[in-house]
Amino acid sequence: MKRNYKIAVLPGDGIGPEIMREGYKILRILKSKLSLNIMTQEFDVGGVAIDKYGVALPKKTLQGCRDSHAILFGSIGGPKWEDLPSHLQPERGALLPLRKYFNLFSNLRLARIYSGLEKLSPLKSRISNLGCDILCVRELTGGIYFGDPKGSKVSKSLNCAFDTEVYYQFEIERIAHMAFDLALTRRCKVTSIDKANVLESSMFWRKIVNRISTQYSQVKLSHLYVDNAAMQIIKNPSQFDVLLCSNLFGDILSDECAAITGSIGLLPSASLNDKNFGLYEPAGGSAPDIKGKNIANPIALILSIGMMMRYSFKLYDVADLIDWAVNKTLKLGYRTQDISENNKFINTSSMGDIIAEILANRIHKI
């Protein structure tokens, strides 16, 4: 009996619906050409949900996600909802509750410098020409963003604010296992990021990561202090395979990795739990300034579908096909405005059409 692949589709706000339309083109190719039993159902989330239902994450949307095997997420937020109380705004009202409800403890951000796009990188050509293929594995539900106590104190003599970095053993163990398991599917290198020369939580982090590493004899483990890591990523990003990071350090370094690729419109991401249920989304935001102009880059969303095939559905060959189609499209010189070095570029829908056609032709030849 063929397996069903149920996907909850949440286009959201801004450019979300536009790039999601291009994602549907890829899913239709997978259904028609590979006979995958992919079923999609669309739900409101973010600002559009606030306008319709008064909340960013309606019960119907949450139930739809529960009934699915994975979530394909567009983008949320925009100026229209910025004046709402912070807990009601699209990001805090939808994305954070989804992460919490499904226990999405790991965030995977993929950063690549694609062949032919080296000049887009802010790095010197002698560095960018060496390439970059970094998978940043960030712990997502612990650390200083969630530790207690936190707050502020006001007095006549001295005002202060404070946060607490707390990591439990099980939190470090599960994200370490995730990083090492992923490294086995790549180049078998893990670089763990900490500040173990100063922070107790980082000393604890390093101790546990070292212990977990003994279960993965094929994977080479190294450690870097976060300040040195930030420098090394700029000096020679090609040396890295998998970065294993705490919540705070991963938040910072994943954005640094994104910057060196030249465009955030190329960067997919995944947030996973221990059952391989995942939320897949482009790394960029809702870009309300270009909403409706048909100029957004859909590649990050399309590559997010590839990550879904790889990590939630374990369809590795399908994921490779999607990656190949995107690579081929870029090698042929097709560009959206954000990655074009001149005035020659194609729009959102054309980019989706071309990638879908190249994917279909590739499948036909197999």
Swiss-Prot record:
Cofactor note: Binds 1 Mg(2+) or Mn(2+) ion per subunit.
A Gene Ontology molecular function term of the record: magnesium ion binding
Catalysed reaction, written as an equation: (2R,3S)-3-isopropylmalate + NAD(+) = 4-methyl-2-oxopentanoate + CO2 + NADH
Main localisation: cytoplasm
PROSITE patterns: IDH_IMDH (PS00470)
Top-level EC class: oxidoreductase
Subunit structure: Homodimer.
Record HAMAP family: LeuB_type1
NCBIfam families: leuB
Protein's name in the database: 3-isopropylmalate dehydrogenase
Taxonomic lineage of the native organism: Bacteria, Pseudomonadati, Pseudomonadota, Gammaproteobacteria, Enterobacterales
